Regions:
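Glycine-rich beta-alpha junction loops
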Residues: 38, 76, 101-102, 157-163
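Alpha/beta enzyme core
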Residues: 1-70, 86-91
């Protein structure tokens, strides 16, 4: 297996994307990785780009979509890493990338833990995520990255509430069997 990875794909000219991916596929790549290197993309842009690559570039290069694995690699510069990962899944990406707690250069990569929680809540994956909190704590301890109190899902204050309406919603979620959340 050969993966062809393009740097800064989301800010590239579509004609250049078509030319470079087509040539890579002709030369034997059977996987491509679409990178939002600078965290520039929006969910809508992510979907548009992936549809362009899957529906036009791959077939125009003479390949069937199912024969080419499409990866999405996103960054968090605009705070859209998780949203873009979800958009990539909805658009048919075979693989999405993420890191523990979103660790990466600049503002970081798409946080894997938040991506997994959202994919589970969307019904896309059926993984047992009961150990995900322990994983985030272990990652925090090992890589010595701060875990803010308000970090989504796993921060100490993520599900704290001070009003009756919010407290009622939390209790209802727990009754539905979402204690881990």
């Amino acid at each position: 297996p050969v993966m062809f990875v393009t740097e800064d794909t989301t800010r590239s000219n579509p004609d250049e994307i078509r030319a470079i991916y087509s040539r890579a596929l002709e030369l034997g790549a059977d996987r491509i990785c679409v990178c939002d290197t600078c965290g520039h993309a929006t969910p809508h842009g992510t979907k548009q780009l992936l549809h362009f690559i899957q529906d036009e570039v791959i077939p125009d290069a003479g390949f069937r979509r199912r024969d080419i694995e499409v990866n999405w690699h996103g960054h968090q510069d605009r705070g859209l890493g998780v949203a873009n990962n979800l958009a990539a899944v909805e658009s048919g990406a075979d693989v999405i990338h993420g890191t523990a707690l979103g660790v990466g250069e600049r503002a970081g990569n798409a946080p894997l833990d938040q991506t997994l929680v959202n994919l589970s809540l969307m019904g896309v994956i059926k993984n047992d995520l009961t150990q995900l909190k322990a994983y985030t704590q272990m990652a925090h301890d090992c890589i010595e990255v701060a875990l803010p109190r308000n970090y989504p899902v796993f921060g100490k204050d993520a599900f704290e509430t001070g009003t009756g309406v919010h407290a009622s919603a939390v209790i209802k979620a727990m009754k539905k069997g979402n204690e881990w959340l």
